Amino acid sequence: MKGRFLVLEGIDGCGKTTQLRQLAEWLPDSGLMPEGATLHLTREPGGTPLGRALRELLLHPPDEAAPCPEAELLMYAADRAQHVQRRILPALACGDWVLSDRFSGSTLAYQGDGRGLDRALILDLERIATAGLVPDVTLWLDLSLEASMARREERTEDRIEAEGQAFLARVADGFRQLAAERGWVGIPAALSPKEVHQAIRLALEGHAALRRR
């Protein structure tokens, strides 16, 4: 039996990391996963050794070494290709489940809507990077830009988070459009972490793609 691939998407500060941890505790005993399946937690960028090196260059580059938008796009694609081939596909082939913090939707939102790079070009590149892999379920943690910025005041920003409000507004709009186009499961992320987790549990328990077959 092929495994299942679940993805959390959303703007910075939406609570993906917190929800990833809570899902990691709940999913193995939820009754959704088949007996003997393992849950693999991962993230983009940085889900492989190569990805971790790329993540550091992308988010915390040395002085005067920040990538241009086109180089940034290619680096994210390289991270994803390695991630898919070396980690995600092998796990799915064994019948395991994979839960990832971000996938290809983030590239369309950040590099497409945020940076203004050509959407058709990104989609062509994504076909190579993903090898045609599509998540079984994408959970979109829907948080307003204002709430996102308020939450991020309490932490140190990386290079992408520090791009400014106009950039992040375009990214937020991009996520909203993608969620509508691709049938993502929208989760209101302004709720408490416990309430968000409960909403995610209900969504997954009722999702047709996760029924055993």
From Swiss-Prot:
E.C. no: 2.7.4.9
Top EC class, one word: transferase
Entry binding sites for ATP: 10-17
Keywords of this entry: ATP-binding, Kinase, Nucleotide biosynthesis, Nucleotide-binding, Transferase
Molecular-function annotations in GO: ATP binding; dTMP kinase activity
Entries under InterPro entries matching the protein: P-loop_NTPase (IPR027417), Thymidylate_kin-like_dom (IPR039430), Thymidylate_kin_CS (IPR018095), Thymidylate_kinase (IPR018094)
One of the record's GO cellular component terms: cytosol
Highest taxon above the source species: Bacteria
GO BP annotations, alphabetical order: dTDP biosynthetic process; dTTP biosynthetic process; dUDP biosynthetic process
Catalytic activity: dTMP + ATP = dTDP + ADP
Role this protein plays: Phosphorylation of dTMP to form dTDP in both de novo and salvage pathways of dTTP synthesis.
PANTHER family: THYMIDYLATE KINASE (PTHR10344), UMP-CMP KINASE 2, MITOCHONDRIAL (PTHR10344:SF4)
Family statement drawn from the similarity comment of this UniProt entry: Belongs to the thymidylate kinase family.
Name of this protein: Thymidylate kinase
Name of the encoding gene: tmk
